[in-house]
Amino acid sequence: MIRNGRGAAGGAEQPGPGGRRAVRVWCDGCYDMVHYGHSNQLRQARAMGDYLIVGVHTDEEIAKHKGPPVFTQEERYKMVQAIKWVDEVVPAAPYVTTLETLDKYNCDFCVHGNDITLTVDGRDTYEEVKQAGRYRECKRTQGVSTTDLVGRMLLVTKAHHSSQEMSSEYREYADSFGKCPGGRNPWTGVSQFLQTSQKIIQFASGKEPQPGETVIYVAGAFDLFHIGHVDFLEKVHRLAERPYIIAGLHFDQEVNHYKGKNYPIMNLHERTLSVLACRYVSEVVIGAPYAVTAELLSHFKVDLVCHGKTEIIPDRDGSDPYQEPKRRGIFRQIDSGSNLTTDLIVQRIITNRLEYEARNQKKEAKELAFLEAARQQAAQPLGERDGDF
C-alpha cells in the first residue's frame, strides 16, 4: 500500500465529522493514460466519504482482460498517487471487485463511473458488490476518454485545440477508432469537452498563498500530464518547507508554435484540469505568457522560478523567456530524474497502433454483447427471467 495522506506531505487518516468513524471508499481500475476524467471520478468518489483507497491493476491483468496498457504498472501507480483526492494506493488490485477486497481494506463501499467494466468472458466486474448493496455510481466525465486521446495522436490534426471546430474528418475517425463493425456503444467514441467555471472550482484548491509560504512558478504545456511532469513537480515541491506552486499553462497556439505537429494533444481547458488535479500544484495560470515577465513575477509575488532539463526554446523575438527571473537570481533548472516526455508517449502509441486498435475493438464487442443481453433480459416477462422462481 502507498499512503498519501490529504496533502502532498502526507498524513494520517482523520476521523469523520463529529468524531464518527471515517467512511472509507474504494475505487479501482487500470488508470492507463490518466486524464482529468479519471481525476474527476476520484474527486466524486472522495466526496462520498472521508478516506479514498484506489486499487490499480497490474499490466498482466489488464493484458488478459483488455489488451496491452500504454503505461507500465509502476508508472500508473505513481500517477494515481499524485492525484490530490487519493489517500492510499493499492498496487496489484484484482481486476474483479469482490466483497473480500472491500473487507480487507475496511471499505464501506466502492465507487465506479456510469459505464461498464467487463472481464475477459464478458461479466460485470462489479456484479458481486452491486448485489451486496456496496456499490455507488458517479457521473462519467463527458468529452474525454483514453480512446479519444489515442485517436488524436494517430490522426495528425489540430481540430481538438481551443477555439477550433472539430473537423468532420477528425470526428469520423475518433468516433470509429477501434470500433467493431456496426458498433453503437454509448461509452465509446468522442464528444467535445465543454469547460465550465463550476468544473474549475471543483478542481481548484481555492487557497491563496499564506505568509511564510514560498511561491514557486513553473510554466509549460503540461500536455498529456504524465509521470515526467509529476516527477518534476515533486522535486520542485521539495525545494521549500512550505511551497505554493503556481503552474502557468500556455495557450494551444503558443504550444503549437514551439512544439509543432498537432501539439498539444490536449487543449488548454483539458490541460488545466489535469494539472489542477495534481497534489503538488496550488494554482494554475490559464493561458500564461510564454515569457516570464517582471509584471507576472510581481503580480504573483514569485520567490522562485523553475524549469526542467528540457530545451528552453527562445521567444518569437529570439529572447530568452526566462531572462527576467535569471536577472533577479531566482531561476533554477530542476532534473526530474525521468526521461518520459509527451513525445515518447505519442511514439509508444504509434509503435503499438495495431495492438491498441485491436484492444478497443475487443472492448467494444464485449460491451455491446453485454448491452444486448441486458436488453433481452429486461424485455422478458418477469417469470421467465434468469433467477426468477
UniProtKB/Swiss-Prot annotation:
Keywords: Disease variant, Hereditary spastic paraplegia, Lipid biosynthesis, Lipid metabolism, Neurodegeneration, Nucleotidyltransferase, Phospholipid biosynthesis, Phospholipid metabolism, Phosphoprotein, Transferase. Transmembrane segments: none annotated. Pathway: Phospholipid metabolism; phosphatidylethanolamine biosynthesis; phosphatidylethanolamine from ethanolamine: step 2/3. CDD domains: CCT (cd02174), ECT (cd02173). The modification Phosphothreonine is found at T341, T342. Residues 1-20 are annotated as: Disordered. InterPro entries: CCT (IPR041723), Cyt_trans-like (IPR004821), Ect1/PCYT2 (IPR044608), Rossmann-like_a/b/a_fold (IPR014729). Its EC number is 2.7.7.14. GO terms for biological process: phosphatidylethanolamine biosynthetic process; phospholipid biosynthetic process. Strongest expression in liver, heart, and skeletal muscle. It catalyses: phosphoethanolamine + CTP + H(+) = CDP-ethanolamine + diphosphate. It is an enzyme of class 2 (transferase). Gene3D superfamilies: HUPs. It comes from the Eukaryota. The modification Phosphoserine is found at S338. GO terms for molecular function: ethanolamine-phosphate cytidylyltransferase activity. GO terms for cellular component: cytoplasm; endoplasmic reticulum membrane. CTP binds at residues 221-222, 229-232, 259, 307-310, 336-340. It is linked to Spastic paraplegia 82, autosomal recessive: A form of spastic paraplegia, a neurodegenerative disorder characterized by a slow, gradual, progressive weakness and spasticity of the lower limbs. Rate of progression and the severity of symptoms are quite variable. Initial symptoms may include difficulty with balance, weakness and stiffness in the legs, muscle spasms, and dragging the toes when walking. In some forms of the disorder, bladder symptoms (such as incontinence) may appear, or the weakness and stiffness may spread to other parts of the body. Ethanolamine-phosphate cytidylyltransferase that catalyzes the second step in the synthesis of phosphatidylethanolamine (PE) from ethanolamine via the CDP-ethanolamine pathway. Phosphatidylethanolamine is a dominant inner-leaflet phospholipid in cell membranes, where it plays a role in membrane function by structurally stabilizing membrane-anchored proteins, and participates in important cellular processes such as cell division, cell fusion, blood coagulation, and apoptosis. Belongs to the cytidylyltransferase family. This is Ethanolamine-phosphate cytidylyltransferase. The gene is PCYT2.
